[in-house]
Amino acid sequence: MEIEVGEPEAQRLKLPWCREAHWRETLPAMLNELDPGPIELDCRDWQLGCRDLHQLRELLNKEGVTLTRIHANLRETLVSAAALGYPTHMASPQGNSSKTRSSDTQPKPKTPQKLLFHQGTLRSGDHLSAEGDVLLLGDVNPGARISAGGDVMVWGRLRGIAHAGQDGDTKAKIVALQLRPLQLRIADAVARGPEDQPQPGLAEEARLEGDTIMIEPARANRFNG
């Protein structure tokens, strides 16, 4: 784990890479080296849920340090951070590859999609749109729309209209804690939402298989934490 100066008057705490050490083992020593004040956390390639980030925040607060921003290489970690209300930044995976690899042969990382975080319920007539992925902490009521160039993630009830992959991305997904929309769209495919009652406490995921939109229980890491 490393500490460096980020933006003016803000430290940056870097967790170790997964292959180097577990962050829980190295954190206590690093906490003793922190100066009171704002800090940015770089989670690198760790997949951290809301509980993990909440625990980190509490440990930092005890040292008089305020967490202001979270960087990560994994989208799942950024989703958890955004759900807690933190500004996020998708970091490039540099430094996690072999040091012996030539810079000429090292593949360039794929440019990450931006994650738009919005807190609040969308009501009839509202439309929330994002170029990349979108995470909504709230409900999408009937008559409201949510759309994204990438994934649509709703930490609540989706009962309006959702369009993922609006620019043609057939790999995009729609995830919600309760997926009962009036209409689903992924790329150019269109489907109506299911009419049966969802299983309590089970998030659902819509994805494209061929030309058909399939709905199934969401993978655990879609709403990690």
Swiss-Prot record:
Record note on quaternary structure: Interacts with MinD and FtsZ.
Q: Which PANTHER family match?
A: SEPTUM SITE-DETERMINING PROTEIN MINC
Specify one Pfam family. Answer: MinC_C
Annotated region Disordered: the residues are 87-112
What Gene3D superfamilies does this protein's entry cite?
A: 2.160.20.70
Q: What is this protein called?
A: Probable septum site-determining protein MinC
Which InterPro entries does the UniProt entry name for this protein?
CAP/MinC_C, MinC, MinC_C_sf, Septum_form_inhib_MinC_C
